[in-house]
Amino acid sequence: CTLCHQIADVPELGTDAGESGHYTIETFADPFDRPAYGPYTNPRINPMRINAVFTPSHSAHVTDSALCATCHNLKTPVLNAGGELTADKFPEQMVYAEWENSAFADGGAEASSCQQCHMARAEGPVKISNRPRNLGTRDNFARHGFYGGNTLILDILDKNRAELEVGDGDFAAAMEATRATLQSAAALVIEETVVEEPAPGERELVVRLRVENNSGHKVPTSYPSRRAYIHLAAADQDGTMLFESGRLATDANGKPTGAIVGVDADTGAGFETHHGEITSEGQVQVYEAIMEDISGNQTYTLLNAARYSKDNRLLPRGFPRDPQTDPVVGKWSDIAMVGEAELDADFVAGSDRVTYRIPLDAATTSVTVTADFNYQTMAYG
């Protein structure tokens, strides 16, 4: 708690100089002068000074997204082929920069801070401390859940809750809230299904769908192991599967392995390119960032990463599509799309459209199409 609440409101906050953990904590001669910043005016000072040796102090910067940039714009060292440090930095995650270039940034059409989305407000006025007993209530209290899209660590902790002396439902409640946040991050819409004749005597079902990003940053964002993908299935009038893209692989016991059938990265054959059109089950639309080392080789080891060879993560609404014509905040190279997505006219700020073409035989009289948008914290392998 005290680390974030000690970060000072300095000019570097939210800039290149203040990112990657380069925060400022003020010095003090008297321990009782050590400030702990919060959003409320006129805080009761003595209880915290006496019990924790911090002086609660009002400062609005703790409600500003720039505070989050301290850790959520993160660049890591780049090594040369000999394992030596270079002058370059790799943009491991640029969540704040993505937000700065979205409609959710300050002054944007949908302005909303990181804290407004990731720190749900308590209902009604609350007492933010049980001491002293005559403490008044405060409105608009931000609950410190920090819910995002990942339950991996929460699940590990939950499995060890007895050793951690944590109650049965605590981690479960956090995981439920996290999954609810993840559900709201994006949406998938089937826009059109139509039968076409690409050639005389041939029929195909054309499915056009759209994936929407409802977040103030890319989806997925942060650490590059994360990926999202489209699973689309089409069955005929008898329930026979005609086509399936994005199916999870299973082991001999029918248990999902985490690999996705048809995804090149999951077979060691490079990585799955971005698709504007999908015509076979061996093609899957995967939204992800793929790292490469200084020699251009694909890598999943962060400290080997020098740049991205693919970044088609869904863009937030308001994001600049063309840096030559659209205004960009900061360095375009830190947040740019990379690979085939750059050339896809349907890959735009806030959404992506994908077309599926499914061959039909003469015996097929009706088709049921289902599609869902899935997320993995850790890519297979």
What does each of the following model-derived ranges do?
Residues 2-362, 369-381:
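Primarily the internal scaffold of c-type cytochrome electron-transfer domains
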